[in-house]
Amino acid sequence: NYKTVNFLAVVGRTYTFKVVAEGETFVSSSTIPALVPLLGIDFIPSSFFGITGNIIVPKFLDPAGVKNSYVFYFYNADSLDQNSGYIFANDDFADGQLNQQPFFGNWSPESGDSVIYEMYGIDTPVFVYYFSFEQNTSGNSGAPANPVSNWSNNALGYFTAQNFQSFSALVP
């Protein structure tokens, strides 16, 4: 985990990370996409396969004509170790539309729970990494393969420059 001080990230700028290890050079780059404002979250009461709670729907308006990709996390604010895992999406099927897609996770918030929702804007190569990682670990793929990385020299993993926003709400 690398951190810098007095560093201001700029939307639209491409950042490059270079690592030299044991005589080999690994390079990755990522561009910070424009922020798509998170307008809030809706809760839809649900009883699904015997589990009752609420499904979370993040509200945001995807800009038309611009390729956007996202990663979402949500947590029970009273127990931050109880989280949904991550959910990733892009605008291939909802370009320019208000998000209506509910997100299902490992946890279903109940009435009275305090929820923290995080939304990250990521560039396309990072989305491709998440997508290929999910395809290879879901149990529904063919032969196992490494996820598509945005690193050179066949390195695994990803480097990301991203925007971030957070929203908290009490489940009604």
Map each language-model feature to its residues.
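A sequence/structural signal for flexible, mid-protein segments enriched
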Residues: 1-172
